[in-house]
Design a protein with these regions (language model features):
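Charged, structured surface patches that assemble and position nucleic-acid processing machinery
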Residues: 125-173
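Structural motif
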Residues: 69-74, 110-113
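Short, charged beta->alpha transition segments
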Residues: 53-56, 91-96
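Active-site-adjacent loop/helix micro-motif of nuclease/hydrolase catalytic cores
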Residues: 75-89, 93, 117-121
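Arginine/glycine-rich "motif VI" loop of SF2 helicases in the C-terminal RecA-like domain
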Residues: 96-102, 128-132
Length: 173
């Protein structure tokens, strides 16, 4: 698709359609705090292994991902920091580090028309990792991603590279 054919609203709809098969989605119309949050997606998985009967459990593991989708005309460093901090704080409230918790990902995703160099640099260099009880109760990573309409680009931080393929499919389909 050529440069900037899809609007941010169309990209948001395509993204939510891609997430809806696996994630619980909560949409936001307009917020009192003027945060450009459009949707919050939650993913939960519980796995366990047992022998013969469920009482003879060998292990169990909980995995979670919390995606916060923001939409802005221009992504600046200030907007990035404000939204990233919000996603981190809200995501940490949802994490329950306990025996059996393996990992949780907090993923702020930005849909924007343009992105400043400072914001791009901050997004790509974002590294937030937290281990709970020396990783006995799991860990948390922050994955960041931005879908930039100008130039049909997708950028992520190192931990968010797994999301890049999904985002590129959304942008180019």
């Amino acid at each position: 698709m050529s440069d900037q054919k899809q609007t941010r609203e169309e990209l948001l709809e395509r993204m939510l359609k891609g997430y809806q098969a696996y994630f619980d989605i909560e949409r936001y119309e307009e917020r009192e705090d003027d945060l450009p949050l459009m949707a919050h997606c939650r993913f939960y998985v519980h796995s366990e292994k047992y022998v013969l009967v469920k009482k003879a459990k060998l292990w169990d593991a909980d995995s979670n991902e919390y995606v916060y989708i923001f939409s802005v005309p221009e992504l600046t460093k200030e907007i990035f920091e404000q939204c990233k901090d919000y996603a981190y704080e809200e995501g940490m409230k949802l994490i329950d580090p306990k025996p059996g918790h393996m990992y949780s990902y907090i993923t702020p995703v930005f849909i924007c028309d343009t992105c400043t160099k400072e914001a791009e640099k901050a997004l790509m260099r974002c590294r937030i990792y937290k281990s709970f009880h020396f990783s006995w109760y799991g860990w948390m990573n922050v994955h960041t991603a931005a879908v930039i309409r100008k130039g049909n680009r997708v950028i992520t931080n190192r931990m968010g590279r797994g999301n890049a393929k999904f985002m590129k499919n959304i942008l180019n389909s």
